[in-house]
From Swiss-Prot:
GO biological process: DNA topological change
EC assignment: 5.6.2.2
UniProt cofactor(s): Mg(2+)
Positions annotated to bind Mg(2+): 186, 238
Record's protein name: Type 2 DNA topoisomerase 6 subunit A
Secreted as UniProt keyword: no
Lineage of the organism: Archaea, Methanobacteriati, Methanobacteriota, Methanomada group, Methanobacteria
Pfam families reported for this sequence: TOP6A-Spo11_Toprim, Topo_VI_alpha, TP6A_N
Subunit structure: Homodimer. Heterotetramer of two Top6A and two Top6B chains.
Amino acid sequence: MNRREIAINKLKSLGDVILDDVTQGRIPRIKVPSRGTSNIIYDEDKRHYVLGDRYGTRSMGNVKQIKKIGQMLYTANFCKDLVAREKTATLRELYYISEGWEVDFADQQESNIVGEDLEVTLGMTREELGLMPEEDGASVYGALTVREGDIEIDALRSGKSGYNISPTIDEVEFVDHDVERVIAVETMGMFHRLVQEKAYKKFDALIVGLKGQAARATRRFIKRVNEELNLPVYICNDGDPWGFHIAMVIISGSAKLAHVNHQLATPDAKFLGVTASDIINYDLPTDPLKDVDVVRLKELLQDPRYRGDFWKTEIKKMLTIGKKAEQQSFSKYGLEYVVDTYLPEKLEAVENQ
C-alpha cells in the first residue's frame, strides 16, 4: 500500500474501534498515548526524544471526555476525506471548518491539539493526514533536482531565493543531485550571502535557509537528504542560546514532538557555529548576554541533548565570557569573509574530527 492508502485505512480504523465497542455492548473508548512530560524520554541510542509506553483512555462513559472523542472522530473523518481526494487543508482551515460541526473547537490551539492526538494515536504525521501548518518551509539553493507530481524543479534555477520546501515533502522525489554536503543557516540574510558568494559551488553544497526555528517540513527534508542521499549536514546559526536550540531541534528533535522525532531528527548533523570559541578566536562583535539568555543557557546544561563535551564546553564558555554574537558579525572583516575564511576553516575542523 502507498502512504495515502495506509492513512485512509488507519483513519477508518479509529471509527471501527468505536463501532466494535458499540456492537459488543461496551462503552466506546479510544486509547491515546500519553504526551505528558513523565512519558517523554530521551533515548540515548536513538539520540532523540521518544514517547514512553503510557497510554490514556478517552471513554464515552466519562461526560467530560465525550466532546473530545467527538472532535477526534470528526477530525479523523475530515482528514479521511482530504486524503481520499488528494487534498490538504491548513490547521487554520481545520479550525474554521469545525464551526460547522456539532463539536466545534473553542480556539485553534484546541484544534491543533486534536490534530496532534491523531498523529500520536495513528502513528502518522499530520502532513500524511492532509493537515498542513501555516509556516513556509526553508529555502534551498544548490545542485538538486526534485519532482513534485509531474513537475521537475531545479534548485539552481528557481531564482535567488531557491526552491521552497513543500509542506508535503514526503511526496517529493529526489531526481538528481551533484552536491557533497548540506549547509543549513539560521537567517535568510546569511542564506543570501552564501548564495551571492557562490558557497554552493565552492563547497559543493546545498544551502538551506532555515528562516529561524526550522519548520517540520524543513526538518523532514534535512533528514531525507541526509539518509537517502547520504549527505552530511552542517548547521550554522547565531551564537546564542536560541541559535543553539534551533540547531539541536534539527539534530535531536523536540520534547513536544517526541511521537514524530523518528521522522524529523537528524542525529548525525553537526553544529559548525557560531560558538563561544568562535567569538573569542575570530574576535567577533558581540552583545552582552541578557538575563533571559543566562537563564536559557543554564537550562540547556540540564537538557540531556546537550550532555556531550562539545556542548557543555561551549555553553559554559559563553556563560563565562557573558557575550553572544550573530552570524552576520563576520561582516566585520568584509562580506566575503564568512565564505572565504570562516566556513572553510570550520568545515575542515569538523570533517577531520
